[in-house]
A protein has these predicted regions:
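Non-heme Fe(II)-dependent double-stranded beta-helix
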Residues: 3-11, 16-72, 78-175
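Non-heme Fe(II)/2-oxoglutarate
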Residues: 12, 18, 23-25, 53-55, ...
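Glycine-rich nucleotide phosphate-binding loop and flanking beta-alpha elements
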Residues: 84, 183, 260
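Active-site region of the double-stranded beta-helix
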Residues: 150, 175-182, 193-202, 208-211
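A short secondary-structure junction signal
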Residues: 156, 170-173, 187-188, 199-206, ...
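A short beta-loop-beta micro-motif enriched in histidine and acidic residues
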Residues: 175-185, 239-240, 246, 268
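Short, conserved beta-strand element in jelly-roll/cupin
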Residues: 182-198, 245-246, 276-279
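Double-stranded beta-helix
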Residues: 198-258
Length: 318
């Protein structure tokens, strides 16, 4: 009932009721995903007719991803990497923008590591032309559109450094198994901006664990908790555990309702950019992203795509 009321509240006031995400977790713990499908279908916006893709940094001659694989497994690798120039721009950005080390915002210094994870502010990221270009990319938008079978909303960009700091996997750095539930339906596209191998923190997923009735009630009854490798290993076949490695510039899309985690780093540092898409904004109430320095092309794009960019707050755009 509370989530239903929040749906009505969202349509009137353009935000969810407080603690809607907690209510979603409680529902998920009870029905193992059935209600999420209902609310997604209730709130989703009819998708537009597919047109020829023109605005993209990728080559146009083949699809970036297998929609069937993404639906079946809960994740899928993109067939093309980001070009070297774009990767270099993003890496440079990660050395010139300040990031949060758990106590304060600092420039990342690999010679002075004090935490497992260094997070960049989404409002800083949204105002960078290299990230605006990816947000506008029609190939990436179409991945979310296909997965939702509806028009997507861009939720937020996220970027962070991971380090080998500490002796045990960090819950705060998402290095224990968990699932995400801030929206009723969402998709994340992850870009590795450094080479990622067994030593420096590959993502791990439990294949197909995004599906209805895919999670054991014994784990769901714990609520929104991190789960150790040993405990979760009691419930899934070893073949279901997948490790995603890749060279810098490689990317994959994932429904992080799957059980997933980042592996603890042994050496080196890992830089990841994540683009978040949602079918609706029901769930956690994040502040709208403050766009202060849009490029001319980003201004025009946002004017033409007001639904996709409804989570943005523009300053002096018009």
């Amino acid at each position: 009932i509370y989530v239903s009321l929040s749906c009505v509240y969202l349509k009137i006031f353009r935000k969810s009721l407080k603690n809607t995400n907690n209510a979603l977790v409680n529902l998920y713990s009870i029905d193992n995903g059935k209600t999420l499908i209902f609310f997604h279908n209730t709130l989703k916006t009819k998708r537009l007719k597919k047109t020829k893709i023109s605005n993209t940094i990728y080559e146009n001659h083949k699809p970036l991803i297998s929609a069937e694989e993404l639906n079946e497994k809960g994740y899928a690798k993109l067939s093309q990497n980001l070009n070297t120039n774009h990767v270099n721009e993003l890496v440079k950005l990660a050395t010139t923008l300040k990031c949060f080390n758990g106590e304060k915002f600092v420039l990342f210094d690999e010679k002075s590591i004090t935490n497992t994870r260094y997070n960049f502010d989404s409002n800083d990221l949204i105002n960078q032309s290299s990230i605006q270009q990816l947000i506008m990319d029609e190939y990436l938008i179409d991945i979310a559109r296909e997965y939702f079978d509806s028009e997507p909303i861009f939720d937020m960009p996220v970027m962070w450094w991971s380090t080998p700091f500490g002796n045990v996997p960090s819950s705060n750095a998402a290095q224990l198994y968990h699932y995400d539930l801030e929206r009723v339906k969402w998709l994340k596209i992850f870009f590795y901006l450094t080479d990622v191998n067994d030593s420096n923190g590959p993502h791990q997923y439990i294949e197909k664990s995004h599906k209805v009735n895919s999670k054991p009630i014994e784990l769901l009854s714990k609520g929104y908790k991190r789960i150790s490798d040993d405990e979760i290993g009691n419930y899934y076949n070893i073949d279901s555990f997948k490790v995603i490695k890749g060279l810098k510039g490689s990317a994959f899309a994932a429904d992080t309702l799957c059980w997933h985690k980042g592996t603890k780093l042994i050496k080196g540092n890992r830089l990841v950019l994540e683009l978040n898409y949602a079918s609706s904004l029901l769930g956690t109430n994040h502040e709208k992203l403050k766009v202060k320095t849009p490029t001319d092309s980003f201004k025009l794009f946002c004017k033409k795509n007001s639904f996709y960019t409804k989570n943005f707050k523009f300053e002096k755009l018009y």
